[in-house]
Amino acid sequence: MAIQHKKGGGHRGRGSKTGRSRGRKFETSRLKDVREDESSGGEEDVDGQPTEDMNDSEGTDVSSESGLDEPPKENSYSTLLKLLNTDAKSNEPARKKRKIKANEPDANPVEVSIPTADDTEQMDEVADTEASASEDENMDDEDIPDEDYAEDIGTDGRNDMFELHFGNPDETELSHKIQACSKAWKSTKADLIDGLYSVVSMPDAGGISSASLPTTPSPADLKLKQKLARNAVSFDRLNSCLTPYIFGYHDTLFCSRTTQNSAKLRDLYCLHALNHVLKTRDRVIKNSAILSRENNGDVELRDQGFTRPKVLIILPTRQACVRVINSFTKIYPMEQQENKKRFMDSFSAADSDEWAHKPDDFKELFGGNDDDMFRLGFKFTRKSLKFFSKFYSSDIILASPLGLRTAIEKEGGKKNENDFLSSIEMVIVDHADALMMQNWDHVEYIFSNLNLQPKEAHGCDFSRVRQWYLDGHGKFLRQTLVFSAFNTPELNALYNTQMQNVFGKAKIMSKYEGAMLNLRLPISVKQTFSRFDSASPLKDPEARFQYFTRTVLASLARGWTESSPRKKSGGTLIFIPSYLDFVRVRNHFANSSQTENISFGLISEYTSVRDSSRARSHFMNGRHSVLLYTERAHHFRRYNIRGVTNIVMYGLPDNPIFWGDLIEYLGSAAGGTSTPTVRVLFSKWDALKLERIVGTARVRSMLLEKGGDTFTFV
């Protein structure tokens, strides 16, 4: 049975633990006729059967997204011989030359001529064969330079970070930095704008690092392709601040993404990705033209990776993918957009009217098509954009973590298909906080499969492969950009282990005033924070459970046993961030003598809508004294729970917005006789969460206070 794709809410929930999907798997068979395949957008069905032309998407199967095409398994030497034999038999006239300067002689045509429209057929043949099949099998218009090609290649590249990073890096310095990456990093800290600060880390190779880089006022100050510069949107203060890190090819972890700045951030990284892809493409075309004019074989030009895909963008939903594509087409408008209608039919949907009362962050994430199972190849030619191109023929791959993992993994113990990720030079992870609510294991799995040595050649011309790829050092030149609403231990682990860029990395975070100060309630709420000792993160779950049952639950149980029309501890909401902790607490309530007389309800991310409605109704009416509620359930549903008089937080929420949502549940108790209370459990391993709730100024004293372990705010 094929994987079912639904629009608007069909896939909200955690991803599969193993990353495997039900149904047919991706296979790597490819069409025999390359021209026919490319003209139809390079689309291949999930089971490996070619589809019809996808320009008209009516009646197409949504599950048939971009596959992993397998180029012919022939080595570059035999390909070169075939090309030479073809040239020897050719009776075509000599290729025309066009001089740039009118008075310049023909003595040195290599320096004065550039490819012209008359060279199209031969240029296509050379670029397709000598420049490797991985850079594209298509022989139409995409090996012809852009209109602004001559102007771009004549630009001084000394201040172009693309040239410094990927064009002509100093081999000795590069080797020294790669060795330093595995030893020690030197970090510096600096304040930025609007409460932001940066921590920049550089390989300790004797250089000087700076945490605060000069801002970039506008796109005109960047070394952009001319066509991109004409359509680039203006920079606000935040973009001007981030541009030096992003366009300077630093790895960047940005932990202050909001609904207000998300569109500007998306335009910024899309501009950077397009600039990188187009400059890479122009360099390959330029060098292919040089090689086609040189017959002595002495020229060595290394400008490629093992495979064509250069940019990987990881997103939470299909609608997020639509927004990225819209940014691409806004910055780089093209009249021809193959398979655009099919893409919009498969990926875009209207917002649900039922969510009009939901908060803005919820509508941004789940608005439109919130399916979290997708993958898409995206390809540029001189005249068109091609959707649903095969991975090995794509420039950019956009995917959800679950969708990409199912493309990598193979059934029956076969080797994973990850060669198409071997030459990724830029990874962009947007809305990372939402990806953690799906299944972060999928993201870690994807990073573990990046920049590995390919198992097969895939038609690669190894004479054009950059030396650092051959040496297995691709990960040290890959740029990783991660955008999240807040920082977490998982993101810190990704930053420390997977961001190994020799040009350095930057972590940009916010200083917090504290979510507990921004409550909108007509009554005062007593907020008590209880600190417990925990020896290590591994032992933290056990220490938390013991403290909860022996201290917090024991005091609540006394209130539940008192006789009154509504028990003193009735209306208690117990918020539990982790599902594993939720299961443990649920079992304790079901089996322990401590809670044998307590009626309780359950709402987790796996609870059906019907059962959730019943549990909320019983809790509001007093039939349930306690309601156990998980963070993921709140993330995916944003229930408005009534009847709450007390809140116990088994752990702090990752998202500070959830703190305000939960405290506002107490508004229904405004007419009661007792003051609503909030009690929170935390340990020293909750420092990042605690900072967002109590504020940067208070968190240190609460973690290190020697005089007591209880802190109360009213």
Curated annotation (Swiss-Prot):
Q: Where is the composition biased (Acidic residues)?
A: 118-145
Recall the GO molecular function terms of this protein's record.
Answer: rRNA binding; U3 snoRNA binding
**Localization (cell):** Nucleus, Nucleolus
User: What's a GO biological-process term for it?
Assistant: maturation of SSU-rRNA from tricistronic rRNA transcript (SSU-rRNA, 5.8S rRNA, LSU-rRNA)
Q: Which InterPro entries match?
A: P-loop_NTPase, UTP25, UTP25_C, UTP25_NTPase-like
Instruction: List every stretch annotated Disordered.
Output: 1-145
Transmembrane parts of this sequence? none
Which segments show compositional bias classed as Basic and acidic residues?
24-38
Q: Where is the composition biased (Basic residues)?
A: 1-23
Q: Name one GO cellular component term.
A: nucleolus
Q: Which keywords does this chain's UniProt record carry?
A: Nucleus, Ribonucleoprotein, Ribosome biogenesis, rRNA processing
Q: Which Gene3D superfamilies match?
A: P-loop containing nucleotide triphosphate hydrolases
Predominantly, its location class is: nucleus
This protein's assembly is summarised as: Component of the ribosomal small subunit (SSU) processome composed of at least 40 protein subunits and snoRNA U3.
Q: What does this protein do?
A: DEAD-box RNA helicase-like protein required for pre-18S rRNA processing, specifically at sites A0, A1, and A2.
The similarity comment for this entry is:
Belongs to the UTP25 family.
Quote the protein name from its UniProt record.
Answer: U3 small nucleolar RNA-associated protein 25
This chain's source organism reads Trichophyton verrucosum (strain HKI 0517)
